[in-house]
Amino acid sequence: MKIHVTGATGFLGSELLQLVPGATGERVEVRDEAAVHELFERLRPDVVIHTAYRQDGEGAREIVVEGAENVALAAVAVGARLVHLSTDVVFDGRKGGPYLEADEPSPCTEYGRAKADAEARVGKAAPDALIVRTSLIVGGPGHEPSKHELVARDPAMTFYDDEIRSPVQVGDLAAALLELAALDLSGLLNVAGADDVSRAELAELVGGRPVRRAPAPPGRPLDCSLDSSRARSLLRTQLRGVRSVFA
C-alpha cells in the first residue's frame, strides 16, 4: 500500500513517515490545484493522509479549506483513499459533554470555521473519504514535545481551567490513522485520547507542577471533548489518555 502524507514535516506528519518508511511526503502547495493533481498523478498513491494545515496567519483559511478540497479532488482522480484530519474545535464546546460524530459543527473561532468548511468540501469532493476529528496532539515522555507541551513548560503562562479537550499521543494517533487507512470506512470518526482534561490540567501533567489558572475569555471553545468509543471498537491501537501518557 503506497501512502502519501501531506504536511509531512509537521508533528503528526513526521510521525507517520517514521512509522511507514516507504511513505512519501513530498511537499506541494495545496492551494495550487494543478500542482496537487500533478503530484498525485506522478506518485499514484493508494492512500493519502491529509494532515497539512495552518491555524492562523496569512493564507490560513485558503490552506485549510481550498487545500483540503484540492487534495480530495486529486485523490479521487487517481483512485486513492483519503483520510482527512479535522479537529474538535469545529464545536463551540457548549453542548455540555463529549461530542459524537453525529453532532452538527458549531465553530466559534476562525480556525474552527475553516476546518468545518473543509469537512464539508471534502465530504462533497470525496464521498468515500474518512474524516477524522481529533484533539490536541502531544508527544509525552521520551518523545519530541509538541507546541502544547512547550507552552505548558513556561512558568509565566496562565492556563484555562474551563476549556476541556481530549488530548492524544502522537504515536497513538499515527498508528490509529494507519489502521483506519486499511479499513473500508467513510464519513466522520472521532479519534482522540481517553482522558478529557482542561488546558490547565494538561499543563500540570506536562510540567509536573501547579499552574496559574483562569477562565477562558469570551469567544473561546469550552468543553470540546470527543467521544471516541466508535474508534476504540474498531482499532487495535490503544488511544491512551494523557494522565497515563504523563504518569
What is the predicted role of each segment?
Residues 11, 174-176, 182-223:
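Mid/C-terminal beta-alpha module of Rossmann-like enzyme folds, strongest
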Residues 1-20:
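N-terminal Rossmann NAD(P)H-binding glycine-rich loop of SDR-like oxidoreductase domains
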Residues 6, 48-52, 82-88, 132-134:
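SDR active-site strand-loop-helix element
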Residues 209-212, 219-247:
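C-terminal amphipathic/interface module of NAD(P)-dependent oxidoreductases
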Residues 30-70, 76:
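NAD(P)H-binding glycine-rich loop region in Rossmannoid oxidoreductase-like domains
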